[in-house]
């Protein structure tokens, strides 16, 4: 266990060295402040634009999913997560980018964060997982139109280095937390790697 914690420390310190992060969180607070659980401190590190979430940020339960938009199991679990969000008002669900499957995954991760800068991040996120069949340019364009996003601003923002850095940092934190693929979850303080059934998620809630 001590070795695992050292690995986490090395990886996340690398992220801090290489990437700009939330100035309100210091290394000392992240690793040595025991007043807050580690999974919640992850959310303090991610800049606001990178937080795609449903529910009250002060909710009693927090579910974090590291996910990829081309991950089949991420798509499978998504409606179950939305069901939990609907049924449990004491639970928030946070979706963090971990685009590992393709360059297209990285493109969509950037696009969702750019949409979040127009306050449409969660809507874009949900729409991507609700696409039937394969996602293509026509379907993507339709989502943008349906959400009434500023297409020009979206294209500019998604190429910004700050957006690239958010995605990189999120993946660093995923790897440092022990993610070996997608989806990977924190259900409160419990780390779960891989698909998890709705019943098991509910069993881990307070």
Regions found by a protein language model. Give the residues of each.
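Extracytoplasmic thiol/disulfide redox context detector
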Residues: 2-7, 16-100, 156-159, 163-176, ...
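Cysteine-centric redox/oxidoreductase cores and disulfide-bonded domains
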Residues: 99-182, 186-206
């Amino acid at each position: 266990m001590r070795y695992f914690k050292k690995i986490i420390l090395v990886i996340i310190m690398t992220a801090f060295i290489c990437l700009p992060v939330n100035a309100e969180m210091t290394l000392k607070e992240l690793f040595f402040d025991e007043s807050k659980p580690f999974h919640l401190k992850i959310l303090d590190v991610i800049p606001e634009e990178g937080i795609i979430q449903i529910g009250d940020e002060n909710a009693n339960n927090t579910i974090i999913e590291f996910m990829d938009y081309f991950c089949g199991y991420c798509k499978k679990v998504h409606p179950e997560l939305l069901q939990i969000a609907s049924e449990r008002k004491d639970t928030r669900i946070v979706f963090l980018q971990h685009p590992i499957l393709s360059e297209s995954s990285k493109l969509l991760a950037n696009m969702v964060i750019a949409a979040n800068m127009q306050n449409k991040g969660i809507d874009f996120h949900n729409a991507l997982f609700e696409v039937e069949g394969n996602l293509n340019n026509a379907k993507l364009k339709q989502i943008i139109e349906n959400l009434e996003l500023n297409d020009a601003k979206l294209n500019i923002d998604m190429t910004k280095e700050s957006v690239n850095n958010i995605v990189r940092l999120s993946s660093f934190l995923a790897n440092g937390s022990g993610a070996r693929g997608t989806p990977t979850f924190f259900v409160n303080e419990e780390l779960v790697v891989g698909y998890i059934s709705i019943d098991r998620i509910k069993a881990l809630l307070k």
